Amino acid sequence: MESLVFARRSGPTPSAAELARPLAEGLIKSPKPLMKKQAVKRHHHKHNLRHRYEFLETLGKGTYGKVKKARESSGRLVAIKSIRKDKIKDEQDLMHIRREIEIMSSLNHPHIIAIHEVFENSSKIVIVMEYASRGDLYDYISERQQLSEREARHFFRQIVSAVHYCHQNRVVHRDLKLENILLDANGNIKIADFGLSNLYHQGKFLQTFCGSPLYASPEIVNGKPYTGPEVDSWSLGVLLYILVHGTMPFDGHDHKILVKQISNGAYREPPKPSDACGLIRWLLMVNPTRRATLEDVASHWWVNWGYATRVGEQEAPHEGGHPGSDSARASMADWLRRSSRPLLENGAKVCSFFKQHAPGGGSTTPGLERQHSLKKSRKENDMAQSLHSDTADDTAHRPGKSNLKLPKGILKKKVSASAEGAQEDPPELSPIPVSPGQAAPPLPKKGILKKPRQRESGYYSSPEPSESGELLDVGDVFVSGDPKEQKPPQASGLLLHRKGILKLNGKFSQTALELAAPTTFGSLDELAPPRPLARASRPSGAVSEDSILSSESFDQLDLPERLPEPPLRGCVSVDNLTGLEEPPSEGPGSCLRRWRQDPLGDSCFSLTDCQEVTATYRQALRVCSKLT
């Protein structure tokens, strides 16, 4: 079997074998930052993982395999995730696995887990990923109970930077939680688990109800269609609440109470208010149209306090000025005007920045609770196809309520592929005009919250929960319309051969001409070269636990070289501009990384600590008015 590599589409005109364009072709819309393009190229060599890596301890186990820590010959530590094809019984889960590989290999950001290499043979898929040695953010916060405001801002800025980058490239994560946010050896954020991610498009709605209960938005728990970014914004609000206050904002012990709290936005008032309370309230708005976007968060004053530039912006070089020059004051005035604009538009005063007294009433404070990702979706189409599909086509072909069936869960032991045909549903819904006399499309009565959640590893994909995990029972979205024609039933023998599912022209590597016609996921044999039916794969019992260490050969799907990551530079903080310095933090666990005690260090300077904040603010506004 020939091996495949992913290479950038640059230089001369690609050959016919390189015309299969995966989803990354449709990801690049914004000029900055760019994502990596991919194309498929054939090579004629195989790889033995036993000779390439020294396997160490196991990091986690899932339904389809395990994640092991390994060391390359160069000494670099990596996390190797092996997926056994004979364990994949649901085409939807296979689609999520492929989507995770293609999206993560396309993203290039210092705070997103990188995929180094992907291997595949007839029985396994092996993914070599970046290793985050300090575990996940859940364990880090649990050990320290509560972070300082400086450390909370440091973490949140990096999370916002990564999610903002994803949204710039029209990728929505949909499963942001503490367990999916890892820490590397330097204490920097690394977002993992893109198994539930997808592309989104303005004006169209996604209809996959997934995520983790305590981080799920009101649209998710109530089964309402959503665009995509607003779901991540709500999850960021929950994360910010946890980072600042050290507790969960909602009560997760009773799912009925949890649904009511999320639907009403009734999160617990913290016992000790913070300067971030305004941003938390903005992110946890029940109305998604009023909820803060990632652009709003990236330019918010609390997120950028102590930094000369907002999240996602590069520091502009100074032209011969010192911190007290007009140029520096103008920069500060522009920053204050931009970051305080939402407050001024809402008629807020400068005093609204100050902390308020905690409201009365004694309510128990919930602790941190690990979350298990939920997945309830009608099977989503090719992500690349969703970019080229016409709105009229989406409106004309919608399955009726009588034609919908609950999708098969990934934890069911028996899969009857010969009895039921795989039905393909559109991944997005176009807005439906409703006349005054016409009833609105019915929505499900039940959300995704039905049973207790289980622990899930950040390295393991959401479609691959822990062995003790359980898929929740959920209602579907029913949209009035003409029923869609079903596919003919598949032959039961087609599920025996799972070869080359990541290589040929599958769901995520179709050309523009192929996207014009409606496509289906197809069987696993349709994604691979035809093989004789007489040669069946080995039974699951014949595969040992340490089969990844065997001498079998793998085809390599080499990914393109990642763009060099710019070094994380220090920047002049507001403290330096105003001549203020903060004392070094004391106490164990207050800092995660080595903070440099120099004028360029990060700052946790709070607005409430400045005695003449009103005068400073007015002076900045006067400078701003003179410049304009």
Curated annotation (Swiss-Prot):
Domain of life: Eukaryota
Post-translation changes: Phosphorylated at Thr-208 by STK11/LKB1 in complex with STE20-related adapter-alpha (STRADA) pseudo kinase and CAB39. Autophosphorylation is also possible at Thr-208.
Residues that bear Phosphothreonine: T208
Recorded GO MF terms: ATP binding; magnesium ion binding; protein serine kinase activity; protein serine/threonine kinase activity
Upper taxonomic lineage: Eukaryota, Metazoa, Chordata, Craniata, Vertebrata
Species this chain originates from: Pongo abelii (Sumatran orangutan)
InterPro entries with a match to the protein in the record: Kinase-like_dom_sf, Prot_kinase_dom, Protein_kinase_ATP_BS, Ser/Thr_kinase_AS
Enzyme class, first EC level, given as a word: transferase
Summary of activators and inhibitors of this protein: Activated by phosphorylation on Thr-208.
Reactions mediated catalytically: L-seryl-[protein] + ATP = O-phospho-L-seryl-[protein] + ADP + H(+); L-threonyl-[protein] + ATP = O-phospho-L-threonyl-[protein] + ADP + H(+)
Sorted UniProt keywords: Acetylation, Apoptosis, ATP-binding, Kinase, Magnesium, Metal-binding, Nucleotide-binding, Phosphoprotein, Serine/threonine-protein kinase, Transferase
BP GO terms, sorted: actin cytoskeleton organization; apoptotic process; cellular response to glucose starvation; intracellular signal transduction; microtubule cytoskeleton organization; negative regulation of apoptotic process; protein localization to nucleus; protein phosphorylation
Record protein name field: NUAK family SNF1-like kinase 2
SMART domains: S_TKc (SM00220)
EC number: 2.7.11.1
Domain Protein kinase: from-to ranges: 53-303
Pfam families per the UniProt record, alphabetical: Pkinase (PF00069)
GO cellular component, one term: cytoplasm
Biased amino acid composition, Pro residues: 428-444
